[in-house]
């Protein structure tokens, strides 16, 4: 638990929603305390909070109280809010939704805090999205086996594998036919582990693998950010391979 009072804590605004006629409930991803829910009293109308509590805003937040909802007592800018539009905006909401769905409140993950900001600034780069997904699962204790196969042998870049989500990659003796399970090349696994650049044919393979892995923990409830992307994709400018709709 974070205690009764926390002062000037670096945090990102993930989400906001109305609470009473004048206040807001704000979901923050803080550096040292993890995901925090807080009530910003007067947040819907007061000039005090204007422009500070929008999603993707980096803030220095101060709050007090215990329990599920703290009381936000102050916030000030902590840098520029990334200028996201089109597919980059939809991808940003996808990142936020992953954190809201997968992180428990008051569960610190300081290693993810700077990675989140770096990923926002790289959107809509698909390799950045896959990297964030992979590091998020690792932080939660659900990391994928990427450097060794099921038999304990090192993964080889030119080899082909069938990935079993509960056990890891199974090396295949021959190039497999499409539709024979979750197929991936060793190069893609090494790229997700950070050993190679994630590009070219590895991108769709990584997308399929990460989508399957995340689905184990997201459950059956659809991601709202995918619906947002479908709306944005109706205009040609918004269409991009990095869309959350492809996850």
Swiss-Prot record:
Keywords: DNA damage, DNA recombination, DNA repair. GO terms for biological process: DNA recombination; double-strand break repair. GO terms for cellular component: bacterial nucleoid. The keyword Plastid does not apply. It comes from the Bacteria. Gene3D superfamilies: Nucleic acid-binding proteins, Recombination protein O, C-terminal domain. Pfam families: RecO_C (PF02565), RecO_N (PF11967). Coiled coil: none annotated. Involved in DNA repair and RecF pathway recombination. NCBIfam families: reco (TIGR00613). Belongs to the RecO family. This is DNA repair protein RecO. It comes from Alkalilimnicola ehrlichii (strain ATCC BAA-1101 / DSM 17681 / MLHE-1). The lineage of its organism: Bacteria, Pseudomonadati, Pseudomonadota, Gammaproteobacteria, Chromatiales.
């Amino acid at each position: 638990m974070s205690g009764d009072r926390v002062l000037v804590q670096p945090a990102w605004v993930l989400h906001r929603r109305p609470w009473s006629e004048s206040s807001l409930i704000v979901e923050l991803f803080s550096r040292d305390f993890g995901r925090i829910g807080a009530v910003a009293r007067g947040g819907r109308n007061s000039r005090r909070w204007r422009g500070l509590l929008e999603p993707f805003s980096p803030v220095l937040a101060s709050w007090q109280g215990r329990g599920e909802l703290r009381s936000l007592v102050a916030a000030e800018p902590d840098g520029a809010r990334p200028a996201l539009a089109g597919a980059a905006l939809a991808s940003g909401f996808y990142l936020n939704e992953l954190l809201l769905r997968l992180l428990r409140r008051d569960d610190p993950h300081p290693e993810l805090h700077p990675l989140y900001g770096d990923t926002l600034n790289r959107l809509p780069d698909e390799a950045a999205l896959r990297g964030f997904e992979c590091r998020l699962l690792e932080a939660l204790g659900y990391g994928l086996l990427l450097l060794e196969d099921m038999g304990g042998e090192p993964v080889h870049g030119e080899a082909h594998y069938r990935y079993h989500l509960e056990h890891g990659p199974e090396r295949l003796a021959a190039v497999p036919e499409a539709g024979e399970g979750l197929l991936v090349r060793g190069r893609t696994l090494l790229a997700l582990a950070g050993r190679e650049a994630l590009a070219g044919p590895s991108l769709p393979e990584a997308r399929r693998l990460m989508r399957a892995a995340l689905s184990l923990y997201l459950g059956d409830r659809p991601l709202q950010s995918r619906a947002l992307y479908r709306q944005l994709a109706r205009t040609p400018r918004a269409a991009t391979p990095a869309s959350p709709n492809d996850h």
